[in-house]
Structure formats: C-alpha cells, structure tokens
A protein has these predicted regions:
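Conserved acidic donor-binding segment of nucleotide-sugar-dependent glycosyltransferases
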Residues: 297-298, 302-309, 318-323
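Short hydrophobic beta-strand element within catalytic cores of glycosyltransferases
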Residues: 282-285
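Short alpha-helical donor nucleotide-sugar binding micro-motif in glycosyltransferases
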Residues: 252-257
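Acceptor-binding helix/loop patch of EC 2.4 sugar-transfer enzymes
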Residues: 81-122
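Aromatic "clamp/platform" in nucleotide-sugar-dependent glycosyltransferases that forms part
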Residues: 265
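Carbohydrate-associated surface elements
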Residues: 140, 161
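Nucleotide-activated donor-binding/catalytic signature segment of Leloir-type glycosyltransferases, i.e.
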Residues: 225-248
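A short, well-ordered alpha-helix in the C-terminal region of glycosyltransferases
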Residues: 311, 318, 325-339, 348-351
C-alpha cells in the first residue's frame, strides 16, 4: 500500500502539487498502552491541527479507509479542517464478508468479532458515509459503495499502475522467455492470500512434475515456518525468500519464473499482478476484485473461483505442461498492462481531490447562506 502511495505521490508532485506523507517524517506517536492501530486514527485530526498552527495548510487530506472515522467526525465539529478523501485499498466490510464466506466454505472456525463486530469495519463504514470523496481500486468495491448508499459522484475508481522499471525489464526479457520456468507466489503467507488452497494445489503439481521449482517470495516468515506446510519430499524444490529489499531484487525474482499464482479470497488490486504482467508471466488468480478487472480468463491469464483447489491445480498443471500457452498468456498480459501507468492513476486521484475540494466549498457556502 505504501508503495502505491509513494508512486501516485510522485506523479502528483510532477503535476505541480505539494505532497506530504504524515505517516513518515511528521508522524510522532505518543506512548500508549493502547495498540497503535487504535491510537493512530485518533491522532490524525490532532496532527493536522498541529501542522496548521505551524503554518502548514492543506487543501485536502487523504486517509486510508480504516483510519478515517475520527477525522470525519472532527470535521463535523470543526469545518475549517481540510476536506478528506478516503482511499480504500480493498473495502474493510467486503474483506470481512469475504473472510466469513471463505471460512464457512472451508469449515474453519469463525470468531464472534468476525461474525458481528470488527472495529476497523465500523470505523471504515462511518468514514465512507461521512467523507468528502472515496477512491477505490476495483469495480466490485465501486458497486458495493453505491449499494450502501454512497453517491456515485462521490466515488472515483482508480487503477494501480506499474513502474517503468518492470515494463522495461519485461520488454528486454520477452525475446528470451523460452528459458524461464517455475511457479512464483509473491505475497504474505496468510490465509487471505489463499495459502490454504495453494499448498495442496502446488503440492499436486510438483508431484506431477518432478523437476518443477516453486518460489515463495516476500512471505514475511522464515523458511522453516513456511516449509512446514509442505510434504518433506518436495521441500528441497521450494525456495523461500522472506523479504525483498528493492525493485532490482524483485525484477530478478520475476525473471526466473514463467507463472505467477495469486489465489487470494480478497484483494484491492495487487501490485504483484501488474508487475508480473509487465514481466510477461502467465497469471493464475481468482476471479474477484481487481484481478477480475484486469485478467480476461484464457486471454491474458487464467482465473478460478475462490477456494476451488481442483481448478487451481488443473490450471497450474496445464500451464506447466504447455509453456507455449504460458508464454502467450504472459505476453498478452504484458501488452495490456502498458496502459496501467502511475501517471494515469495520479491524474484520476488529482481529479478526485478537486471534486472533494469543490464539494466542500459548496457545503460551506450553503451553510453560510451564500449562492454561486
């Protein structure tokens, strides 16, 4: 998420705007026994007040969806606070519903907080209803926002972009794609990323193909922890890379593989998908969220239903056996992703900011009894 914020921020700066990241150099948390995830939302309004007193005035404030409620509440009290744009990288309520459905599908335990009450969801829902504008990343989120009563004129759907480094590396690599093989999973080793389905699927494919290599990168856990989920007879062919430090390292990882697997039950719009597409990998993912907006099944990738281990296994097995098809899907994805630039994303975000500013001006004018 932070990478996306910096990439769009760079674009906005190029367009002539001034952008500050309050989670960076300005952020100073007070000592508290309360977990930071709960104190941060409460401190955002105070931080904006403090910066204003120091002469730092903002035209608009962008806040991540689960953190926006206290700021939106404070704006009702003090309308001199800048208008707020709520940015959702995957709606909290939809994430809750997706996890609940997935756990029931897999007969996993369901906590009371998941079923009835989740503080981040309550904060997010309040923010969505009371912010000046909402930015979301996929058409399913857009539709849900309208379903819960958010005016479509207060919604901007933005696509994530891909950095030029990946596009250039993919262009150079395309003629040599015959030399690539192996399957890559790139992401945190958590339930939401589909690890429960990935383990049996990839295990079966690796049993079918004794020379197949599989990489789990950026997982956030050490090798022993992740490998414990797999049978001993295939562990030697699984490479674990807990952390990735820079784009050069990431590009080298993509370069070594022909297939990306992303079986998440919920996402916003994963950067991994666009980067893999830029590098010409064939993508196997679920038919939901931002993946469904980009992947056309059988044309520039393969999609399967959430939790469908059999289809996931068959799709991966088919691509391993048919590298010509894998290259064809990868090349189609590489061509399509050329249009997904951070410049385009930044322009849409700037327009969303302007809509929030103009909406706030109209609201203040009406409160003062002024006419335009």
């Amino acid at each position: 998420m932070s990478r996306a914020m910096y990439c769009t921020g760079d674009t906005l700066i190029t367009m002539g705007h001034q952008v500050d990241y309050i989670f960076g150099e300005y952020w100073q948390l007070r000592a508290s026994v309360i977990p930071k995830r709960f104190t941060v939302p409460l401190q955002i309004p105070e931080l904006i007040y403090s910066l204003a007193q120091k002469g730092k005035q903002y035209d608009v404030v962008e806040i991540h969806e689960p953190l926006a409620a206290p700021y939106c509440f404070n704006r009702k009290i003090n309308q001199n606070l800048p208008p707020v744009v709520l940015f959702s990288h995957g709606l909290e309520k939809r994430n809750q519903l997706a996890e609940l459905a997935y756990r029931r599908q897999k007969c996993l335990p369901v906590s009371l907080s998941l079923r009835f009450l989740r503080l981040t969801v309550l904060q997010a829902m309040y923010g969505l209803q009371n912010c000046d504008h909402v930015i979301c990343l996929n058409s399913e989120d857009n539709g849900y926002l309208q379903q819960i009563g958010v005016d479509k004129n207060r919604i901007t759907q933005v696509n994530n972009g891909v950095e030029s480094q990946f596009l250039l590396a993919g262009e150079i690599l395309a003629p040599a794609s015959l030399s690539r093989s192996g399957i890559l999973f790139l992401g945190s080793w958590v339930l939401r990323k589909g690890t429960l389905d990935l383990v049996p699927a990839i295990s079966q494919v690796m049993q079918h193909h004794p020379s197949l290599q599989f990489t789990i990168a950026g997982c956030g856990f050490d090798a022993d922890t992740v490998l414990a989920d797999f049978a001993e007879d295939i562990r030697s062919r699984i490479q674990i890379i807990p952390k990735i430090s820079n784009n050069e390292e990431l590009i080298e990882i993509y370069r070594q593989h022909s297939i990306l697997v992303l079986p998440s039950y919920f996402e916003g719009q994963p950067l991994t998908m666009f980067e893999a597409a830029a590098m010409g990998l064939a993508i196997v993912t679920t038919n939901i969220c931002g993946m469904a907006d980009f992947i056309e099944n059988g044309i520039n990738g393969i999609t399967v239903s959430v939790g469908d281990v059999e289809s996931l296994t068959q799709s991966l097995d088919h691509l391993v056996e048919n590298q010509t098809l894998a290259r064809s899907l990868g090349e189609a994805a590489r061509q399509k992703v050329q249009a997904y630039t951070w410049e385009s994303a930044g322009e849409k975000i700037a327009k969303a900011y302007e809509k929030a500013i103009q909406s706030n001006k109209k609201h203040l004018s009406s409160k003062l009894g002024l006419t335009h």
